[in-house]
Amino acid sequence: MTIEHKRSSKGEIEDLIKARYSLIWITSPEETRVEESLRKLCVEREMRLEVWSITEGFKTIANGQGTRDVKDPMKAIDHVMRAEGRALFVLRDFHPFLKEPAVVRRLRDAATELRKTKKSLLVLSPITKIPPELEKSI
């Protein structure tokens, strides 16, 4: 599901998570505002929030700690798949990596597998650039 970020989108994101959407795309240039909304949502739903970037790897928003050595996009997806418990994972600026067929395939596989879990994967990007192969998964 693709969402243009706006004030009311927190409820929409919560509905998608409750409905077990495993792969969500949010388009917004306001990273900080979106992540703060997601943090509040995760606190309310008692979920862990981990945010990934190519420069920092994963960090858990609640305590700032994380797996900083996971900077490769494929390893980031693998990290999400291996993680346990209820969690929301945010991939910042992931759209450039979707030019790689292996990354697209791995995301499709992840979307299918994550439906069986209590985890969701959210792509946060300033632009909407979804490969056709992923359109039905997002």
Residue locations for each model-derived region?
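ATP/nucleotide-binding catalytic cores
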Residues: 2-138
